Amino acid sequence: MRTLWIVAVCLIGVEGNLFQFGDMILQKTGKEAVHSYAIYGCYCGWGGQGRAQDATDRCCFAQDCCYGRVNDCNPKTATYTYSFENGDIVCGDNDLCLRAVCECDRAAAICLGENVNTYDKNYEYYSISHCTEESEQC
């Protein structure tokens, strides 16, 4: 079981700060990030390719696009400050790079929350080998 946890942490932790983004996801969806989004569709989790499979997967695609726009800020490892105020995620960094990464994660968490009803268990642990359609443009 511990090995599975470590593998899941490595997979979802590839983009953004795992614990920070996971906390945002939990607040907005009520779902644990590692169990629900670490390997989902073509974009949630490790990398991404092909066409997003549903609205939930499109949230992760949009986050990948957002990270692409702030790549100089090291979005995969950035540690930023944020808080929850009246149910809202508030990014608090004065550092523009860290704030930009936080805003990418914030937008993705909000999107996942707004689309939690589209979550399809058929896309859990979805093989990237199925993600062969041409990708949309960011």
UniProtKB/Swiss-Prot annotation:
Pfam families recorded: Phospholip_A2_1 (PF00068)
Tissue specificity: Expressed by the venom gland.
Disulphide bond pairs: 42-131, 44-60, 59-111, 65-138, 66-104, 73-97, 91-102
Keyword Methyltransferase on entry: no
Gene Ontology biological-process annotations: arachidonate secretion; lipid catabolic process; negative regulation of T cell proliferation; phospholipid metabolic process
Residue ranges of coiled coil: none
One of the record's GO cellular component terms: extracellular region
Entry keywords, A to Z: Blood coagulation cascade inhibiting toxin, Disulfide bond, Hemostasis impairing toxin, Neurotoxin, Phospholipase A2 inhibitor, Platelet aggregation inhibiting toxin, Presynaptic neurotoxin, Secreted, Signal, Toxin
Source organism, top-level taxon: Eukaryota
Location in the cell: Secreted
Annotated signal peptide: 1-16
GO MF, one example: phospholipase A2 inhibitor activity
PANTHER family membership: PHOSPHOLIPASE A2 FAMILY MEMBER (PTHR11716), PHOSPHOLIPASE A2, MEMBRANE ASSOCIATED (PTHR11716:SF9)
Family per similarity comment: Belongs to the phospholipase A2 family. Group II subfamily. D49 sub-subfamily.
Known partners and oligomeric status: Heterodimer of an acidic and a basic chain; non-covalently linked. The basic chain is toxic and has phospholipase A2 activity (chain HDP-1P (AC Q1RP79) or HDP-2P (AC Q1RP78)) and the acidic chain is non-toxic and functions as its inhibitor (chain HPD-1I).
Protein function: Heterodimer: slightly affects neuromuscular transmission acting presynaptically. It has a low catalytic activity, a low anticoagulant activity and weakly inhibits ADP-induced platelet aggregation. Monomer: has no activity (neurotoxic, catalytic, anticoagulant and a ADP-induced platelet aggregation), but inhibits phospholipase A2.
Protein name: Acidic phospholipase A2 inhibitor chain HPD-1I
Taxonomic source organism: Vipera nikolskii (Nikolsky's adder)
